[in-house]
Swiss-Prot record:
Functional description taken from the UniProt entry: This toxin causes paralysis and death to sheep blowflies. It does not target insect sodium channels.
Removed propeptide positions: 24-44
MF GO annotations: calcium channel regulator activity; toxin activity
Tissues and organs where the protein is expressed, per its UniProt entry: Expressed by the venom gland.
The keyword Disulfide bond belongs to this UniProt entry's keyword annotation: yes
GO cellular component, one term: extracellular region
Protein name, per record: U1-theraphotoxin-Ct1b
UniProt miscellaneous comment: No effect of the synthetic peptide are observed on voltage-gated sodium channels from the American cockroach Periplanata americana or the German cockroach Blattella germanica.
Any Pfam family hit: Toxin_20
Organism: Coremiocnemis tropix
PROSITE patterns assigned to the protein according to its UniProt record, in alphabetical order: HWTX_2
Family (UniProt): Belongs to the neurotoxin 12 (Hwtx-2) family. 03 (juruin) subfamily.
Length: 82
């Protein structure tokens, strides 16, 4: 069980690193604007602070009024785009 958890955490970390590298590459090619990346980072940060992960597949809701928005969902305290 510990091995599976470690593999899952490392896989998620690699996915985040890959996603960030691809976003920087697209920004360098002027495909996306740097303001768009800043907005995505702000949404992820807000979500990671306010996300309460629920069990049994229930949707993720933030503490109080904050929620992931704009197609973002909270998984493992991160906002992920679906």
């Amino acid at each position: 069980m510990r091995t599976f958890t470690l593999i899952a955490i490392l896989t998620c970390a690699l996915l985040v690193i890959y996603h960030a590298a691809e976003a920087e590459e697209l920004e360098a090619k002027d495909v996306i604007e740097s303001k768009a990346l800043a907005t995505l980072d702000e949404e992820r940060f807000e979500c990671s602070l306010s996300c309460d992960i629920k069990k049994n597949g229930k949707p993720c809701k933030g503490s109080g009024e904050k929620k992931c928005s704009g197609g973002w969902r909270c998984k493992m305290n991160f906002c992920l785009k679906f």
